[in-house]
Amino acid sequence: MFKVKLHKRVIKFLQKLNENDRKRIFSAIEKLEDPFSQPYEKVKGRKDLYKIRVGDYRIIYRVDKEDKIVSVHLVDKRERAYNRL
């Protein structure tokens, strides 16, 4: 199992969401404790970043296999997420 860490801006963004969207995103983030058990995609042009799609939202994260840490760097709507990297 990996430890999941959330960036400050992720926490701030999640606080602004409605409860239904927040639950869906937290559910996806919890699954990152075992990051390679579910389908994942790499972010194009960024060899160290991965993404998960949750409806209109994207979760952008990095996996440190050596230290067993998943760092969630960004959660945002698709149209804004990739511009903020």
For each feature predicted by the language model, list its residue ranges.
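Enriched for short, Lys/Arg-rich terminal
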Residues: M1-K5, Q15-K23, V54, R62-L85
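Basic, amphipathic "hinge/linker" alpha-helix immediately C-terminal to the N-terminal HTH DNA-binding motif
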Residues: L6-V10
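Flexible interhelical turns and helix-capping residues at alpha-helix boundaries
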Residues: L14, N18, E33-F36
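A short, surface-exposed loop/turn module that caps and links secondary-structure elements
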Residues: A28-I52, Y82
